[in-house]
């Protein structure tokens, strides 16, 4: 329970800090075309800073000031992994299926891999590492289950 509370507070703090740091997008009109993804979906073209969506603050912060967005992503990944472990710890099959979701992390990593910004590189590394960690956990649960049942590994 302490882990959830701590991770939740880290998530809330890093979300507020990311939102604040990302508000810098409002004073950089040359970046609106590349970082105001949600605003362009909502309004079409952006003519002034009041057209910028609050969600675009997070995109801008993730691209150019990635410390707090990375902390935000790490804390939510930790909460999801902790919840998955807690829900699936009694059933090895469910546990393996949960961590087999590592493919989603690799897909996310591949989606941001082409980003020319420092934040894109950091998020690629984060998602690829989380995917590798999840795959390793799935492999370890399979190996542990086979060894526990006394099966020979092939």
Question: Language-model segments: which ranges?
Answer:
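Individual transmembrane alpha-helix segments
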Residues: 50-80
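Transmembrane helix-loop junctions and nearby membrane-interface residues
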Residues: 15-22, 83-90, 110-117, 142-146
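Alpha-helical transmembrane segments of multi-pass integral membrane proteins
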Residues: 96-154
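Hydrophobic cores of alpha-helical transmembrane segments in multi-pass inner/ER membrane proteins
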Residues: 4-11, 75-79, 129-144
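Cytoplasmic juxtamembrane interface segments
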Residues: 1-17, 62-69, 147-148, 153
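Cytoplasmic juxtamembrane regions at transmembrane-helix boundaries
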Residues: 69-105
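Membrane-helix exit/juxtamembrane interface segments
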Residues: 13-39
């Amino acid at each position: 329970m302490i882990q959830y509370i701590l991770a939740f507070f880290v998530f809330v703090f890093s979300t507020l800090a990311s939102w604040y740091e990302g508000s810098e997008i409002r004073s950089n009109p040359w970046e609106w075309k590349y970082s105001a993804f949600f605003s362009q979906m909502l309004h079409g073209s952006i003519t002034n800073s009041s057209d910028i969506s609050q969600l675009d603050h997070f995109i801008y912060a993730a691209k150019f000031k990635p410390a707090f967005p990375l902390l935000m992503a790490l804390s939510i990944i930790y909460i999801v992994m902790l919840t998955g472990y807690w829900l699936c710890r009694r059933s090895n099959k469910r546990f393996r299926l949960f961590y087999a979701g590592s493919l989603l992390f690799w897909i996310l990593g591949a989606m941001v891999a082409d980003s020319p910004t420092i934040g894109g590189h950091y998020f690629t590394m984060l998602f690829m590492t989380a995917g590798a960690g999840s795959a390793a956990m799935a492999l370890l649960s399979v190996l542990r289950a086979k060894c526990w049942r006394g099966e020979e590994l092939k």
